[in-house]
Every structure is written in structure tokens, then in C-alpha cells.
């Protein structure tokens, strides 16, 4: 008997919980030799939700690109999860009874992939997010959900058995805050978890130069990527309700760019996009960057040693490019493999591990 699907309604930031989950599930289905998250696949199939008609225009468009076999932006968290899994497993191999804290957990399912049968796991997120998590993922044994802001030190008191080791993971969260807030966060960790470790990801300043994202590819490949984006955009447009189309049109109208669409119908948008130069596309991306930190973040980090200057109690254990040691599996498209190589070589996206 087929289990009834769970219908949930989300909007805004909370909607991204589902997209990161969807990314892990999709990568698991398409590239299981690289990464497999059985719980994410199970959960994604359990939820009654149409990802292609997101209220957030970028996400609906990008998800359609993923379905067409192009580089999936929401596949990146899955590859990050693979790197985090390896780090968590290495730590609990040395500290089998450790407490592991998943900061800004969302609908993350790391516990199910790394559990050794004796760790205690904590999933920390805002109350509204934890409420959704409890609905979809009830707390398993040795797991505690904490409904608090990551900046509120009160949650630190909920972490028990710290003498057995504390390991924290913060995937895809710190870049969305101001540097002053990130400094406060690390100081709080050093106050409460001396000797603990944390792993997190952050983009470099180079990541802000959106025009350069396509410069590493040959002209023919850049053209193919543009065609794929238009096709994904059109697919989203045909399914999206009018209020979502209006939201995107308003966003485009607010951009300070030399050209704008002449109308609000699909033909107007397609004609506008196809006549844009590479420079204009770069300006458009920078305009989106300026208007929406929700997508592109605020805080960047070039070198983890910068954090040790904030607080002498903090030491660098490791820092490496996001895709380092991830196999360039032949099942991945050439575009994805080239993107991984370029990202690592340029240092755009990195993973950092610190001792507090």
C-alpha cells in the first residue's frame, strides 16, 4: 500500500529547506557512486510539493536546469555534504561517544549517514524550522532538536557530554551573515566548547564576480549554457502562477542595467536575454547580488588564518577547495567536471576546519 504524501506549504527562506533536500535526493539518484543519501531520497518522495513552481524565481529556474542535466546549483550542497561526512566520520572514529552539533540543520540528514551507534547528535535551527523538521523527521534515538538562533548562547548549555568531544558542522549558513555576526559566533563557540572542532564552508571574494563564472569555458560551451538556461527559464515560466511572474518582472525592472525587457511576456524576456552581451549579463548578476543576499551571501573568507586573528583560542586544522578529493566521475557531464576543476583552481568555494 502506497503511503500518503505529506503536504506542506512553505515560503521564503523556509522554502530553501526543501531545495537542499531535493538536491541531495537528485544527486543520490543520478550519481549514486559519488554520494548516496537514502533518507533524503525517502523524504523527498514522501513530500507532496512541486519544486518546479517555487515562489522563489531563481530556485524554480535552477531546478529545471538540474532536470535537464546541467550543473545543478542545489547539487552543490550534496557534494559539500559528502566532504562533511568524511570529516565527521574521521572525528567520531577518534571520539566514538562525541556530541555532534548540526548548526542551521534545516532538513539535513547527515546523522543517518554517519551514525556509529554511540554518538549523540544535536540539530539546531530556528523554532519555525524545527517545527517543520519534527513534522517530517521525528527525533530518532540519541538525537536532540534545539529550537534556537545559532547566535544565542543559550543553546550551548543544551550540549551534554562535552568531555567526550564536540564536533560542529555549519553547512551553507555563515556566509549569509555580516562579518561582525560571524566573529561573535566564533567567540561564543570558544567560550563554551574549548577543544571542540567545527567544519564550515565559505566563498571567497572572487565568488562575487558573477561575470567571471562563465569566462573559463570555451565560447561554444558558454553559448550552450545560455541556451540551456533559456530553456529552463521557459519551462519554469510556463508553469509559474502570475504572482511569481510578476515578482520576477519587478525584480528585473529594479535592476540598474543598460537594457531591460520591453514587456512582461515570455517573448519579451527571451528576446532581451538573447541580445545581452557577456558584460551586461555580469552587470545583471551583480544587480541580483546587491538586492538579494539571501542567494549570494554576505561574508566571504579567503584564508582561515584570518579567523585566528579574531580570537587567539582558535586554530586552523584544515582548509581546502570544495571539490578537492571528490572523484571526477565519468557519469558527471563534462560541464560539471570542468566547473569543479575551475572552482577548485580559482579558490571560489572552500571548506574550513578549525579547533576552538
Model-derived features with residue positions:
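Rossmann-like AdoMet
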Residues: 1-101, 107-148, 162
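Short amphipathic alpha-helix with an adjacent loop that forms part of the alpha/beta core around
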Residues: 154-163
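A conserved beta-strand element that flanks and buttresses the S-adenosyl-L-methionine
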Residues: 168-169
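Conserved beta-strand signature within the Rossmann-like core of class I S-adenosyl-L-methionine
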Residues: 192-205, 271, 275
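Conserved class I S-adenosyl-L-methionine
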Residues: 199-221, 282-286
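Short alpha-helix
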Residues: 294-324
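Core SAM-dependent methyltransferase catalytic element
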Residues: 332-356
